[in-house]
Amino acid sequence: MFAIAAPVAARDTIGIYQGWGAFRDASPARCYAIARPVMAGGRSSGFASVATWPKRGLRASLHVRLSRERDRSAGVTLTVGERRFALVANGLDAWAGDAPSDRAIVAAMRSGRSMSVEAVGVGGRPFVDVYALSGAATAIDAAVLGCSGG
């Protein structure tokens, strides 16, 4: 079994679904599916999450913590199967640029076997973080349902 990236502040575990976990925080109400990469190209492990924040109007919103700080002049690309998505990023964090991109990425994750996030690190060395997607769709659904009332 893969290590699950369980946030320190997580209040309730909704469930563990293969390499993905689903969690709910009570205040502010938010739910998320989260996993660590099965292969990290950087110095830390990083994580990928898909969160639902009812009060912010966010549903199934992607966030990736990269395994190393990226060169800010380089882009970040997420790939699932044949689909490639450019992400918005700062030093360590990357996310979809808008809601339609979030929906397209999550749809690709649901049908994919693996997902990779590629960037160039500070110093010019490329790196890639790879995620297994087994259990991702179930964890994402559980997170959405976990916050459906709140």
Describe the role of every protein-language-model region.
Residues 5-7:
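N-terminal signal peptide c-region/cleavage motif recognized by signal peptidases
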Residues 9-150:
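A generic "folded-domain core" signal
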